[in-house]
């Protein structure tokens, strides 16, 4: 007989990681990094029609030290890249990044020297949200997907090793502007 048979019915069994993931996913504090038209759609998501508060995100944080989700909305110029990295480094662990819009994800239609071809060359991105600009419903769907990822994330040393390996791989990749292909 296992432990499950000896406990009274209705008794909840879970792992510490599962419980911590459930608590973390319901208490995300987003910081905005709105740089273009995607920021307007991000602001619309906080309105009563879409009700971002039901996901535990009542207010966007003004300081990165109070946030654990960075939503990069819009294109990032080369001069803004170090500022984005500084904001990311100031955030408390655990932290997540959502690249909102095609400009944040891959540079969008701005294929020139002045625009970073994807913020994943500056910070590690957890969720990519396509669209130009993506609708508030798509942002809500991306947040739900991020909740699923957070629920399944390991705790402690395993999480730190996985995060460090992902960041090293992303920063060591070839920049999109250096890639040669059919569109060049």
UniProtKB/Swiss-Prot annotation:
Class of the enzyme per the UniProt entry, highest EC level: translocase
Keyword Nucleotide-binding part of the UniProt annotation: no
Keywords annotated in UniProt: 4Fe-4S, Cell membrane, Iron, Iron-sulfur, Membrane, Metal-binding, NAD, Quinone, Translocase, Transport
Cited Pfam families: Oxidored_q6 (PF01058)
Cofactor remark: Binds 1 [4Fe-4S] cluster.
HAMAP family: NDH1_NuoB
Name this protein carries in UniProt: NADH-quinone oxidoreductase subunit B
Primary gene name: nuoB
